[in-house]
Swiss-Prot record:
Its main location: secreted. SMART domains: IGv (SM00406). It is found in: Secreted; Cell membrane. This is Immunoglobulin heavy variable 3-43. It comes from Homo sapiens (Human). Residues 45-52 are annotated as: Complementarity-determining-1. Residues 1-19 form the signal peptide. Residues 20-44 are annotated as: Framework-1. V region of the variable domain of immunoglobulin heavy chains that participates in the antigen recognition. Immunoglobulins, also known as antibodies, are membrane-bound or secreted glycoproteins produced by B lymphocytes. In the recognition phase of humoral immunity, the membrane-bound immunoglobulins serve as receptors which, upon binding of a specific antigen, trigger the clonal expansion and differentiation of B lymphocytes into immunoglobulins-secreting plasma cells. The keyword Secreted applies.
Length: 118
């Protein structure tokens, strides 16, 4: 499969580990443009609700691109212009989990998606 195909794209997920801090992403799958996908990130090894959390992505052959952030309490959210109105970031501090709901997906959303802490 080539990334240039206009009818499907792959959103891949990697696991990120840094010392005792662990962020494990899940939810990657092949989706048709116009479809929806929800990514999850399970955090451990730090006090999750003390931190602003981010989603970043890396498209094939490109550098890292910041996607979105959410404040420690979920009260403030910010988005890159490229995803504004289509993506929604959320968190559940009781589950130490971060989410990214992605709607109206486009071929240019094809990337590796990572969660990150401040």
């Amino acid at each position: 499969m080539e990334f240039g195909l206009s009818w499907v794209f792959l959103v891949a997920i990697l696991k990120g580990v840094q010392c005792e801090v662990q962020l494990v992403e899940s939810g990657g799958v092949v989706v048709q443009p116009g479809g929806s996908l929800r990514l999850s990130c399970a955090a451990s090894g730090f006090t999750f609700d003390d931190y602003t959390m981010h989603w970043v992505r890396q498209a094939p052959g490109k550098g890292l691109e910041w996607v979105s952030l959410i404040s420690w309490d979920g009260g403030s959210t910010y988005y890159a212009d490229s995803v504004k109105g289509r993506f929604t970031i959320s968190r559940d501090n009781s589950k130490n989990s971060l989410y990214l709901q992605m709607n109206s997906l486009r071929t240019e959303d094809t990337a590796l998606y990572y969660c990150a802490k401040d």
